[in-house]
């Protein structure tokens, strides 16, 4: 079935995007010079500084030093931030004796990954976070010129390494967060917590969860990380994810916000775009796991530099696509 779909797309598929801003980005870690992202593109700090435990280490005591660093750097390099919100604070989870979890990011993260004990305390943090970076001129970060508009609520909740809670807990946190953000920042764009691939267990989780959150996010979100066996999906899961969304009556743009490939990256990126991805965020040169070859990285960077900003992509043949731009110009890529 998948082979038939690819053949069909080869001759017919056309994807049109709403605008022509950058279609590319990277996961970033500001402490690593090679992981700070490219100018004029998207960045998704990961895990990033938007962690309740980092910002409010004690109740009522907010420290914005780390978050401000990321925002200021992004402004200086004309990067658009996709901010991942992590709703966990050690002090808060201790208040109702939550069990500790193994941190997926070591000591720099948090010791607890459960649902907040007090949604009111979480709301206070969330409102403070949005208020500082929404750009409304009230209580903004000093020097803020490029507000944060895109908010990614949580990360791969179907994996216990990132969230120690039930599906119902996730749904409650997600919908609650979305409502709070939208009320405070009406032009905010809510990005679904990234699905950790499209393996059977992922599909089962999201087939149940998506109908419960679909009215509370604007962008659907999928991740593709190569497994321990080093295997990758040719379309970086975008085709399976699109099919899942359709099966639960979700009609939203698709972003691929963690892209790791073990084959030719340009081909994989093109296949993902052809299957409906509007934005692809690379995991970055120093991300854990399998590394992209230097040759592959060079080709990917050249592809991004030469073809970014397109408004639509059309498959012409099995190894040729056509990109269209806002001014009507077209570019052909053979890969």
PLM region spans:
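Sec-dependent N-terminal signal peptides
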Residues: 4-14
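N-terminal substrate-binding region of glycoside hydrolase catalytic domains
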Residues: 19-140, 146-148, 152, 158
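Loop/turn elements at helix/coil->beta-strand transitions in domains of secreted/extracellular proteins
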Residues: 21-24, 38-42, 76-81, 146-149, ...
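A cross-domain feature marking catalytic cores of carbohydrate-active enzymes
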Residues: 28-30, 45-47, 83-87, 152-155, ...
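Short, flexible/disordered intra-domain loops and linkers
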Residues: 55-60, 97, 163, 231-232, ...
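Active-site cleft segment of glycoside hydrolase catalytic domains centered on the general acid/base Glu
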Residues: 96-217, 221-243, 247, 262-271
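Aromatic- and carboxylate-lined catalytic core of secreted/periplasmic carbohydrate-active enzymes
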Residues: 261-335
């Amino acid at each position: 079935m998948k082979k038939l779909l690819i053949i069909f797309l080869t001759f017919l598929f056309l994807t049109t995007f709403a605008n022509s801003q950058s279609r590319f980005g990277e996961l970033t870690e500001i402490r690593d010079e090679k992981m700070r992202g490219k100018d004029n593109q998207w960045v998704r700090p990961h895990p990033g500084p938007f962690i309740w435990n980092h910002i409010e280490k004690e109740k009522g005591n907010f420290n914005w030093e780390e978050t401000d660093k990321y925002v200021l750097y992004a402004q200086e390099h004309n990067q658009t931030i996709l901010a991942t919100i992590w709703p966990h604070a050690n002090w808060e989870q201790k208040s109702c004796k939550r069990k500790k979890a193994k941190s997926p990011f070591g000591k720099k993260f948090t010791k607890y990954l459960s649902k907040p004990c007090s949604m009111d305390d979480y709301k206070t943090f969330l409102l403070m976070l949005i208020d500082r970076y929404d750009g409304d001129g009230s209580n903004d970060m000093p020097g803020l010129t490029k507000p944060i508009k895109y908010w990614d609520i949580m990360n791969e909740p179907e994996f216990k390494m990132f969230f120690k809670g039930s599906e119902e807990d996730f749904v409650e946190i997600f919908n609650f967060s979305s409502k709070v953000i939208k009320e405070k920042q009406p032009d905010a764009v809510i990005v679904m917590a990234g699905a950790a691939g499209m393996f059977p267990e992922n599909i089962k989780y999201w087939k149940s969860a998506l109908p419960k959150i679909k009215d509370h996010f604007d962008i659907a979100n999928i991740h593709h990380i190569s497994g321990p066996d080093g295997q990758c999906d040719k379309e970086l899961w975008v085709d399976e994810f699109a099919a899942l969304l359709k099966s639960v009556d979700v009609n939203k743009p698709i972003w691929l916000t963690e892209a790791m490939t073990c084959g030719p990256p340009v081909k994989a990126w093109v296949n993902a775009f052809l299957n409906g991805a509007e934005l692809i965020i690379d995991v970055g040169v120093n991300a854990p796991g399998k590394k992209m070859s230097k040759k592959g990285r060079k080709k990917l960077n050249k592809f991004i530099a030469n073809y970014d900003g397109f408004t639509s992509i059309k498959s012409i043949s099995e190894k040729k696509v056509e990109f269209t731009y806002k001014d009507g110009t077209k570019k052909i890529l053979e890969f």
